[in-house]
Amino acid sequence: MTKWNYGVFFLNFYHVGQQEPSLTMSNALETLRIIDEDTSIYDVVAFSEHHIDKSYNDETKLAPFVSLGKQIHILATSPETVVKAAKYGMPLLFKWDDSQQKRIELLNHYQAAAAKFNVDIAGVRHRLMLFVNVNDNPTQAKAELSIYLEDYLSYTQAETSIDEIINSNAAGNFDTCLHHVAEMAQGLNNKVDFLFCFESMKDQENKKSLMINFDKRVINYRKEHNLN
């Protein structure tokens, strides 16, 4: 894992209206090439969902954990889940399809539970999955992200509206997206690193430029805020 502790993720879902599977794979491979050759902050992570205990009772089913490289994070799905994570002093993985307000509430539950169990979480850093779509035309950026997600959200019967989900991710021009990402980090007490997904962007050259620029700006942001 790189010292900057950022990464990318891919949504493992395909629908006919989006694009051919071969193009989806080609775009994903291009993302990996950019990471390898042109940037320095991104980790490539593999998701493996397990459970925090070996017994599969109702409580542990609420607390799936996800391996990100060599690190283990608890998927922040409910107050019960994050209380369980706090008891073990394990970091959280915040979902891209939750509202920012829900993420903040879950973090508050986590911190309160850690205090209750007398667990030191001062050095714990969480992760937040975010979709990023940058376009000089913000309407186009949001439209591309909406098209990319709409069938997945319909299939999973998401409780949150697609407009709220888009507003809880990052779609717009570059400066707006970067500011929004920083705001979300601050809302979570600067205790989160990010997993970005750029795959909703149709323009591959624009995606490459974005990833390289994000690379530079995120490194500077972390240095300015002593997040090494």
From Swiss-Prot:
InterPro entries registered for this protein in UniProt: Bacterial_luciferase_CS (IPR018235), Luciferase-like_dom (IPR011251), Luciferase-like_sf (IPR036661), Luciferase_bac/NFP (IPR002103)
Keywords: Flavoprotein
GO molecular function: alkanal monooxygenase (FMN-linked) activity
Coiled-coil ranges from the UniProt annotation: none
Gene3D superfamilies named among the record's database cross-references: Luciferase-like domain
Reported cofactor(s): FMN
Cofactor: binding comment: Binds 2 FMN per subunit. Each FMN has a myristate attached. This flavin-fatty acid linkage is probably the result of an enzyme-catalyzed reaction, most likely the bioluminescence reaction itself.
Family stated for the protein in its record: Belongs to the bacterial luciferase oxidoreductase family.
SUBUNIT field: Homodimer.
The protein, known as: Non-fluorescent flavoprotein
